[in-house]
Amino acid sequence: MAFSQYISLAPELLLATAIFCLVFWMVRASRTQVPKGLKNPPGPWGLPFIGHMLTVGKNPHLSLTRLSQQYGDVLQIRIGSTPVVVLSGLNTIKQALVRQGDDFKGRPDLYSFTLITNGKSMTFNPDSGPVWAARRRLAQDALKSFSIASDPTSASSCYLEEHVSKEANHLVSKLQKAMAEVGHFEPVSQVVESVANVIGAMCFGKNFPRKSEEMLNIVNNSKDFVENVTSGNAVDFFPVLRYLPNPALKRFKTFNDNFVLFLQKTVQEHYQDFNKNSIQDITSALFKHSENYKDNGGLIPEEKIVNIVNDIFGAGFDTVTTAITWSILLLVTWPNVQRKIHEELDTVVGRDRQPRLSDRPQLPYLEAFILEIYRYTSFVPFTIPHSTTRDTSLNGFHIPKERCIYINQWQVNHDEKQWKDPFVFRPERFLTNNNSAIDKTQSEKVMLFGLGKRRCIGEIPAKWEVFLFLAILLQHLEFSVPPGVKVDLTPNYGLTMKPGTCEHVQAWPRFSK
């Protein structure tokens, strides 16, 4: 070959060499020094620049479950140039989040997280130090206290029961009105406002603006939040996407800005009526702690209250709305299950009084139905991403500090090693042999609210709320769809997975008042 031909090929050779060096550097950069006796987590080879973005696809819970079947409970992928460790298997996840909880309690510093309450959210903030832990306990205790505390002027056992009973009965009336007017309804639009009113009353008491246009706009657009705070969101791993036209990201920013402004306004208005000798809601309790902060260096400066209320509101809103919506659609899909719940309610509660939280132990089939909703739909497919706080190891694999961690809850709930026929909807799997109680061993295998030090602070109130809403709705109503209408149970991926829209649900009164 002539020298001139070599010269003409030089640009191509230089380009090929540059690409090779870049890929080699990226591979080397993604590898870490592994201590003796440990290994790097296994995983498939990714593509240059994008890593495993195409492999993860639009349904990461499914694609990463398939990869776990090939590579095991601890595997590693790359999204862009960022390494991500994916954990599957109940025992492996418990080992990481519970037994080694301090190692895995961090949050990755993701771009989408910085947009939530201006990057100061207790739930999404990378901070995991002692001040974060103390504020988390405070928020958890406040939420729990105003769930179980009782109003001496009320017949209800606690504030939560009082608020849910009121809203559930109002929802029954709304659904009957929709039936009288158009003969059918779409569940989400009916349920979302009622659930928001419950957590709003818990947070703000009588100061919550139930019917304000501002509040309704926020709750009806909450999907703009859950669609963006997801495991595998490309904008978190490819910075260039933040500067390109991105309607979903724009809606996400707008939602967060509007929500913070709404909470700031409501908190400020509530402060005008604050009486430290009459604490009747969560925000009042936080005001009192804020005053203690000024007096003796407590945990909550006043500016942090909005951030904490934001986390509490979020913990008690979207999960409950999604659970009730899925429940209604699965009830119309499996009418025999609905019939068994009706029979249990008629036997235990009857029709002369309203269901109460104290009825839970006597309504095991309803409880089993709810557990199967959580397991079968796995509508929180991943926890909010974790990160490691220090170099650690798991199952013989080295995981360095600040490694992003995905927890695949969907895989746990559909693991054939844990569940017989995991893709069949069967509430009976959670009952003891005589069907008289919940099988605790089975119920503890369901993952929906995370585990360990980042477990959802609203788990207990959310479970109580879902139970009482469904008990009251099903005491009064029978849900169905017209003959020939098929319900779409295909979930739409997000932080919480929503079912497809169904505008033809019907609710018929079971008895005359």
Swiss-Prot record:
Annotated heme binding sites: C456
Pfam families: p450
GO CC, alphabetical: endoplasmic reticulum membrane
Transmembrane segments: none
UniProt keyword list: Endoplasmic reticulum, Fatty acid metabolism, Glycoprotein, Heme, Iron, Lipid metabolism, Lyase, Membrane, Metal-binding, Microsome, Monooxygenase, Oxidoreductase, Steroid metabolism, Sterol metabolism
Record GO terms (molecular function): caffeine oxidase activity; demethylase activity; enzyme binding; estrogen 16-alpha-hydroxylase activity; estrogen 2-hydroxylase activity; heme binding; hydroperoxy icosatetraenoate dehydratase activity; iron ion binding
InterPro entries per record: Cyt_P450, Cyt_P450_CS, Cyt_P450_E_grp-I, Cyt_P450_E_grp-I_CYP1, Cyt_P450_sf
Binding locations of substrate: F225
Residues bearing glycans: S68
Catalytic activity: an organic molecule + reduced [NADPH--hemoprotein reductase] + O2 = an alcohol + oxidized [NADPH--hemoprotein reductase] + H2O + H(+); 17beta-estradiol + reduced [NADPH--hemoprotein reductase] + O2 = 2-hydroxy-17beta-estradiol + oxidized [NADPH--hemoprotein reductase] + H2O + H(+); 17beta-estradiol + reduced [NADPH--hemoprotein reductase] + O2 = 4-hydroxy-17beta-estradiol + oxidized [NADPH--hemoprotein reductase] + H2O + H(+); estrone + reduced [NADPH--hemoprotein reductase] + O2 = 2-hydroxyestrone + oxidized [NADPH--hemoprotein reductase] + H2O + H(+)
Membrane topology (UniProt): Peripheral membrane protein
Family matches, as CDD domains: CYP1A
Localization per Swiss-Prot or TrEMBL: Endoplasmic reticulum membrane; Microsome membrane
Induction (UniProt): By 3-methylcholanthrene (3MC).
Pathway(s): Cofactor metabolism; retinol metabolism; Steroid metabolism; cholesterol metabolism; Lipid metabolism; arachidonate metabolism
Cofactor(s) listed: heme
Family listed: Belongs to the cytochrome P450 family.
Protein's UniProt name: Cytochrome P450 1A2
Lineage, highest ranks first: Eukaryota, Metazoa, Chordata, Craniata, Vertebrata
Gene: Cyp1a2
